[in-house]
Amino acid sequence: MDAHTIIVAATAIAVGIIFGAAGLGSAIGWGLITSKTIEGITRQPEMRPQLLVNTFIFAGLMESFPFIILAFGFWFLFANPFLG
């Protein structure tokens, strides 16, 4: 095999691992955000509106992470900078 084929194959494997890690990280993040929000609401019910606002803000920030990773992954797949 030539170097071009090896680079393309390694990039495809790496991007697959990166996509899986981004999805797993997003799922873990959602779980942590919601569990801590429920704990906070249970502990102090009068803080519910503030906790929900903060939850949605941080959930939106956390949800943008997989989309950024998706863009970088597709960039490496279709416009691979390592192929020169």
From Swiss-Prot:
NCBIfam families the record matches: ATP_synt_c (TIGR01260), PRK06876.1 (NF005363)
Molecular-function GO terms, alphabetical: lipid binding; proton-transporting ATP synthase activity, rotational mechanism
Keyword terms: ATP synthesis, Cell inner membrane, Cell membrane, CF(0), Hydrogen ion transport, Ion transport, Lipid-binding, Membrane, Transmembrane, Transmembrane helix, Transport
Ranges that cross the membrane: 13-33, 56-76
Species annotation: Acidithiobacillus ferrooxidans (strain ATCC 23270 / DSM 14882 / CIP 104768 / NCIMB 8455)
Any one annotated GO CC term: proton-transporting two-sector ATPase complex, proton-transporting domain
Primary location recorded for the protein, binned into one broad class: membrane
Family: Belongs to the ATPase C chain family.
Membrane topology: Multi-pass membrane protein
Its job: F(1)F(0) ATP synthase produces ATP from ADP in the presence of a proton or sodium gradient. F-type ATPases consist of two structural domains, F(1) containing the extramembraneous catalytic core and F(0) containing the membrane proton channel, linked together by a central stalk and a peripheral stalk. During catalysis, ATP synthesis in the catalytic domain of F(1) is coupled via a rotary mechanism of the central stalk subunits to proton translocation.
SUPFAM superfamilies listed in its UniProt record: F1F0 ATP synthase subunit C
Pfam families, A to Z: ATP-synt_C (PF00137)
Site (Reversibly protonated during proton transport): 63
The protein, known as: ATP synthase subunit c
Gene designation: atpE
